[in-house]
Regions:
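Flexible glycine-rich active-site/ligand-binding loops centered on an Asp-His dyad
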Residues: 134-137, 143, 148-163
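A short acidic/small-residue loop/turn micro-motif
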Residues: 34, 120, 152-154
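Hot-dog-fold acyl-thioester-processing enzymes
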Residues: 2-96, 156-266
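Hydrophobic beta-sheet segments that form the core/acyl-binding groove
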Residues: 94-140
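A general secondary-structure signal for short beta-strands and their flanking turns/coil
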Residues: 25-27, 110, 128-130, 145, ...
Length: 266
């Protein structure tokens, strides 16, 4: 009887910089149906209190079927779909552009995401490079709900892999008004400031005006870790403390999208 063990390597280590190709289309795995539990946990982790996402009665008075899922929670979940293919081996996420919220997301909706590689640039040290992708998330009816561009620095695995042609996409400085989506059913005539707790409306604000919000929030690793798991974002730099101690950062990095959520909540 042989004691030989037949071991095969079926573990996916994710994509490294040299694995990406210009115009490559990636259909990301694990569609996600969003439920009440995600919404409740998101509030617990961020303190978000936007009334449209809190009260069915308010949302319905404005023309919605029910309260929509918080835009940023839905975005983080859609974004999380891209991580295993795009940025599980990231050095750091570098930026976002052309982010558009195209359709409300409701409890029970299922989100799926795909990405197209639109740019590549290897860094001068030859150890990493920047990948530009345009991602689109759709619901179960194939309606686009989000679209965005991001660029992320990704490690190389094979240092001898050939350098790809540098292609840096031309991106908009901001999303023009003509590209912003306002729901056709929106009816603001029944909007009531008593529901928001604030008295100021759109025409009360001025360009250049600065508002110093009184609240603050101390960020800790446990909250960040739980939130990033909620979004199913499995990038190693957010979780692997042993690995990150060997980098110039010296510690885990927080998912920047969660910081955006905390700032919005404050």
């Amino acid at each position: 009887m042989s004691n030989t063990t037949n071991t095969t390597n079926k573990i996916s280590t994710g994509n490294f910089f040299e694995d990406f190709e210009l115009n490559q289309v990636i259909h990301h795995a694990t569609p996600r149906t969003i439920g009440e539990g995600e919404v409740a946990l998101y509030i617990a982790l961020t303190g978000a209190r936007q009334v449209l996402h809190s009260a069915d009665t308010v949302a319905q008075s404005l023309g919605y079927n029910a309260r929509p899922v918080d835009d940023l929670l839905a975005f983080h979940i859609a974004f999380g779909k891209t991580v295993p293919d795009i940025s599980v081996n990231a050095v750091a996420n570098l930026g976002y552009a052309e982010v558009r919220f195209l359709h409300p997301v409701y409890i029970g909706d299922t989100l799926s995401t795909s990405s197209t590689v639109i740019g590549l640039k290897q860094n001068s040290n030859g150890k990493s490079g920047v990948v530009y992708v345009r991602s689109v998330s759709t619901n179960q009816l194939q309606q686009p709900v989000f679209s965005w561009v991001r660029w992320v620095m990704v490690h190389k695995n094979d240092m001898n892999a050939p350098t790809p042609e540098t292609v840096i996409p031309n991106l908009l400085d901001f999303v023009p008004n003509t590209e912003l989506t306002v729901p056709s059913f929106l009816d603001a005539r029944k909007f009531n400031t008593a529901n928001t707790g604030g008295q100021y409306l759109w025409d009360d604000y001025n360009v250049g005006e600065r508002i110093n919000h009184p609240a603050g929030m101390t960020i800790n690793d446990s909250d960040h870790t739980l939130a990033t798991k909620l979004y199913q974002n499995n990038a190693r730099l957010h979780f692997d403390d042993v690995m990150m101690k060997q980098t110039a950062f010296g510690r885990r990095l927080m998912y920047g999208g969660h910081i955006i959520s905390l700032c919005r909540a404050l």
